[in-house]
Amino acid sequence: MLQHLRPTLVLGVALTLLTGLAYPLAMTGLAGILFPVEAAGSLVERDGKVVGSRLIGQSFTGDRFFHGRPSATTAPDPTDASKTMPAPYNAANSGGSNLGPTSAALADRVKADVERLRAENPGAPVPVDLVTTSGSGLDPDISPEAALFQVPRIAKARHLPEERLRDLVAAQVQGRTLGLIGEPRVNVLALNLALDELAGK
């Protein structure tokens, strides 16, 4: 009996060490050498301080900043561990809202967002990504149209010409990956950091 179990146990231990230890360590080391910024989380620094990651969205509020997509992520309610509460861009709990197209709560939330955005920029069509969440709830990017939609609000709040802000958005647009994958996009964190630099000049 032992002679039949021994090869299985040896193979199980060997594969565990190989795939659970050696392979992950090798890939982590290789990634750190070939792609040091990406392997460290694509962190963004300003004045020597980490202010975010290019890969995870942040909740920007107020009229002076570009806003990202809505986020449906949640966190445990500190007053009742059996409940959750909204926590936009919570990377520890990535996920969508599970609200389907027939959900009254989703329809009400989108309607309220559309009305708020129409009041902000009357006459302009509201870009869909400003009222819909991504599957992960962590999307760091918006469409160029969504960024341009917000220009009048930011120009008024920061006392900057709209043309300068449109040029800023155009400079931050990233094309399709490899020219084929995805859509043109703007990283909201990078755009807001560039906005702060522009406003500081």
Curated annotation (Swiss-Prot):
It is found in: Cell inner membrane. The keyword Nucleotide-binding applies. The keyword Transmembrane helix applies. InterPro entries: KdpC (IPR003820). GO terms for cellular component: plasma membrane. Keywords: ATP-binding, Cell inner membrane, Cell membrane, Ion transport, Membrane, Nucleotide-binding, Potassium, Potassium transport, Transmembrane, Transmembrane helix, Transport. It holds the Pfam family KdpC. The chain crosses the membrane at residues 17-37. One of its GO terms (molecular function) is ATP binding. Its main location: membrane. It is a single-pass membrane protein. The system is composed of three essential subunits: KdpA, KdpB and KdpC. Part of the high-affinity ATP-driven potassium transport (or Kdp) system, which catalyzes the hydrolysis of ATP coupled with the electrogenic transport of potassium into the cytoplasm. This subunit acts as a catalytic chaperone that increases the ATP-binding affinity of the ATP-hydrolyzing subunit KdpB by the formation of a transient KdpB/KdpC/ATP ternary complex. Belongs to the KdpC family. This is Potassium-transporting ATPase KdpC subunit.
